[in-house]
């Protein structure tokens, strides 16, 4: 069965890190090239003294002390050339002279016997590196399965401690102690911590302004660019119906669109969704849960129709969709319904603005891990990009009681950065206010009588 914990874990860690004034980019199910480009964008947020944190949940392995994150398009069997080396990301972070580098890796650390290459990664000697591994070397990571959406084992305990005003290694030590008391994973999974931290560095260190304020402002604009939501809008049809469209971000590459009827003519007797050849599985549903929106549902307005659009990082051109109505009036008698349509262009929302689908740049993390047969030395055929989220069926809830299962995880990652005070450099301020929500003011309870297909055809329109 599809496991659900990574999506829940990424969502909750995103909210916790934002409370700590981190700029957070949260992404799910990326291909290899998308992962490498996402790392490039993450690095743009870093500069001298900034605290950088990377959380990853998904398939992974460890060879010769190096950890590898496996993208969704990796072949079977996969090798290091198909994956992203965590230590190569660390090397690039060190080049930014960051104040703290934290890696939280919620993945298996078994040896990959299909991969015999030895990475040649030369790291600087810096006393600011912390690794929190969800499991021990050469061991597997687990998650609990149940009839509801719950956290993985690591984040189940991490989220209770992450906001503590303590040195990050102290926080992880306490998480390890908590995990050690958990009967379900005793003897199967234990948190491992590796650290070179020589000073008291905490994720709660205050964010202050300093000489690097201008640079921080530039980086904040870069982050804001990837989290800009479309403006809510009102659509008026010739028939007298008025519709409100609103937008929310579930993740940096997942957009939620919700709509409701604001006004309709009193003599309208029938109005329903236009039946077109579009898969309605995640479109125009009366509850967020029907579309797979389990985590954001409590934050959305009620009495709407909801659509969930994922895989935004694959969007190459502006996103155009058609809002379609069909209905009848009292005066029409037995005549067939009339159709009305309007085209809506929301350009490139959220992470789509950063074009993660682009070819990998030559100065990306490919260059930090010189391995035989790596893409930068022996280019192979490009992976075909499949729809993001790979449509894992999160609606299939397990009926069994809690049990342990090997982490066959859909990929999820959180990258965050913040500039706390505490390192003698010139710290600068980074605001981490979450992306703007466009919430319509009006609402209607009359959803059964008047329905709208606000995305019945997705089109790509040249910029």
Language-model features, listed with the residues they occupy:
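Cysteine endopeptidase catalytic domains of the caspase/legumain-like
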Residues: 1-463
């Amino acid at each position: 069965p599809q496991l659900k914990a990574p999506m829940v874990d990424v969502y909750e860690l995103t909210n916790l890190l934002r409370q700590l004034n981190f700029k957070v980019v949260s992404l799910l199910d990326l291909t290899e090239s998308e992962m490498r480009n996402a790392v490039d964008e993450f690095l743009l947020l870093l500069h001298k003294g900034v605290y950088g944190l990377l959380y990853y949940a998904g398939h992974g392995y460890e060879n010769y002390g190096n950890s590898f994150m496996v993208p969704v398009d990796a072949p079977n069997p996969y090798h290091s050339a198909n994956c992203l080396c965590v230590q190569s990301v660390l090397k690039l972070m060190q080049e930014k002279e960051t104040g703290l580098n934290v890696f939280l890796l919620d993945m298996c650390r078994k040896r990959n016997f299909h991969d015999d290459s030895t990475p040649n990664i030369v790291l600087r000697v810096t006393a600011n590196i912390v690794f929190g591994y969800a499991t021990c070397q050469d061991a597997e990571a687990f998650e609990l399965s149940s009839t509801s959406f719950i956290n993985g084992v690591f984040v189940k305990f991490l989220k209770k401690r992450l906001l503590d005003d303590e040195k990050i290694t102290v926080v992880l030590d306490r998480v390890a102690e908590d995990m050690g008391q958990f009967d379900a994973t005793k003897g199967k999974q234990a948190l491992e911590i590796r650290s070179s931290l020589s000073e008291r560095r905490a994720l709660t260190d205050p964010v202050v302004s300093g000489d690097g304020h201008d640079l921080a402002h530039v980086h904040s604009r870069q982050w804001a660019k990837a989290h800009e939501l479309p403006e809510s809008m009102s659509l008026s049809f010739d028939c007298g119906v008025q519709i409100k469209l609103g937008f929310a971000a579930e993740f940096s590459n997942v957009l939620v669109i919700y709509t409701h009827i604001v006004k309709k003519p009193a003599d309208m007797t029938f109005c329903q969704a236009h039946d077109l050849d579009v898969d309605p599985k995640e479109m125009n549903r009366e509850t967020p849960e029907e579309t797979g929106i389990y985590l954001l549902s409590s934050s959305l307005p009620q009495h709407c129709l909801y659509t969930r659009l994922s895989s935004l990082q694959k969007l190459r051109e502006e996103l155009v969709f058609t809002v379609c109505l069909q209905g009848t009036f009292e005066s029409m008698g037995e005549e067939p319904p009339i159709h009305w349509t309007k085209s809506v262009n929301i350009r490139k929302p959220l992470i789509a603005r950063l074009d993660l689908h682009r070819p990998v740049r030559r100065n990306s993390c490919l260059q930090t891990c010189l391995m035989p047969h790596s893409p930068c030395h022996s280019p192979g055929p490009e992976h075909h990009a499949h729809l993001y989220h790979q449509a894992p069926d999160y609606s299939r809830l397990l009926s069994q009681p809690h049990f342990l299962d090997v982490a066959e995880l859909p990929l999820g990652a959180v990258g965050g950065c913040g500039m706390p005070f505490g390192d003698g450099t010139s710290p600068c301020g980074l605001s981490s206010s979450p992306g703007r929500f466009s919430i319509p003011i009006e609402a209607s309870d009359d959803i059964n009588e008047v329905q709208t297909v606000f995305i019945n055809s997705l089109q790509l329109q040249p910029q």
